Amino acid sequence: MDADTINSFFLIGALLIALSVLLSPVSSKLGIPILLVFLAVGMLAGEDGLGGILFDNYSIAYLVSNLALAIILLDGGMRTRVASFRVALWPSVSLATIGVAITTLLTGLMATWLFDLDLLQGILVGAIVGSTDAAAVFSLLKGRSLNERVGSTLEIESGTNDPMAVFLTVTLIAILSSTGTGLSAGFLALSFVKQFGIGALLGFAGGWVLWKVINRNQLPDGLYSILTVSGGLIIFALSNSLGGSGILSIYLVGLLLGNRPTRSRHSILHVLDGMTWLAQIGMFLVLGLLVTPSNLLSIAVPGLALAFGMILFARPISVWIGLLPFKSFTPREKWFVSWVGLRGAVPIILAVFPMMAGLPDAQLYFNLAFFVVMVSLIVQGGTLTKAMSLAKVELPPKPEPISRTGVEIYPTSEWELFIYRLKADKWCIGEPLRSLSMPEGTRIAAVFRNQELLHPSGSTRLEEDDTLCVLAQEKDLAALSLLFSEAPEKASLTRFFGDFFLDIEVKLADVAMMYGLNLGYELQDKTLSNIVEEQLGSTPVLGDQFEWQGLQWVIADVVDHQVTKVGLRLPNEEEEGEEED
């Protein structure tokens, strides 16, 4: 490769990345996932597109995709709160194992019939597209206010279900090739245990070692993110080499680093944010270049049937069976979880396996995987907002600071500087600073007005467009958001948590007359917490609702995983009119 070729490679690569970035706003205008834009740019630059670039190197595509996926999962793990495992761990594990197996089987049966394949070939297609994709799920759910039970289940499932899909894919390839003659049930069981066991062990152990190394070494600030990524990739590669799941390992590494006091954590997250975007762009550009759109035309009709069969039939059945033991999920939540079974890069990466193994019909498997991914991103990803509304899993948006920066004055500092800009509909406009009920231990470090720094006192009144710099910790974010909150834009969300709020420990007898409750003798001594547990079980989350005594009750506040307030929503004329219609 001469200098001109290398320079052309840099020029084309940089142009494609820049074009992807500049076209990214199109996704919000058209209501399509941004990942689809990156994929489309790759396809337009490819063999059948305007660019005419011929790219068919599956080994390079496999390398780029795995590297990108590892970075995306490391970042996703660091941003996942361990607290979410309280309500979502076991449902996620069930979906990541039983759910993937059921989806694989049902999709495989459809593929066998639609494409006249052998049963094992059809099930291989099912295994390739059987798992949800972490890159797609993390990207589409980022910044959305979702019921914790649902959002956490989807994120943890997408980060942990790849080992099952990889295990099934590799096993079926071995059976279909000459190397599968010596396979036994014991060997398969051992392989399954190795995938999950080694992946989990190296993820936790390697993550703990990396955490110690980061905290014990004093380095220039910019090197901590490089150490984190390189350490994560070492564990990712080592896990794969030992027969484990590198994908699971690096997700757990991120989870451990993100939930422990890690030196320069905020700086690491800022760098990872940019690296994750670059990884997503690079991965989907390469996968777009790899496909030949003209080859998809011949499978368009049966491919659509397979994609919609998986979306409307296989995925919902697998979710309902997988979540059967978990009574806390409502039918609406199960429906939403089944709808957000997004497919992305992972199925396309798994479709490269048969190509590299030289299996017959490998090109068909790849084209089918690509087709299913495109349909999933367009149909499921494009309707996500509407699905949230229909399933009623959307929570009122929590006002976020316009900027937040770590104040890392010592290695394990949890202090941050939150920046808020006050708009006209902020409820604290016109209030003197002394009247603000700031969370204990927090301070307003600075106030800017008309781009000038003020010297505020307790009598300083806040005005529209003031910028506040607040020194606090992440645990204070909810209280600060409430203090500097603005009215929800959607009218349907203004009464979401109720018209009146009751303490969870209030006695029913004390409020029965006020709210028209009809209490029998057995309810006289009960508290509201008893009713909540009877209706929602022991792990309710913010936004959970139930109807009791003709009224709608909503979990309105949760502190340290304990319900503290319940909202009472009274029926109004508009709601009654809608019900009559």
Swiss-Prot record:
Keyword Cell membrane: yes
Signal peptide as annotated in the record: none
Keywords: Antiport, Cell inner membrane, Cell membrane, Ion transport, Membrane, Potassium, Potassium transport, Transmembrane, Transmembrane helix, Transport
A single cellular component GO annotation: plasma membrane
Function statement: K(+)/H(+) antiporter that extrudes potassium in exchange for external protons and maintains the internal concentration of potassium under toxic levels.
Bilayer topology annotation: Multi-pass membrane protein
Name used for this protein in its record: K(+)/H(+) antiporter NhaP2
Location of this chain's protein in the cell: Cell inner membrane
Any Pfam family the entry gives: CorC_HlyC
Activity-pH behavior: Active at alkaline pH.
Lineage: Bacteria, Pseudomonadati, Pseudomonadota, Gammaproteobacteria, Vibrionales
Major site of localization recorded for this protein: membrane
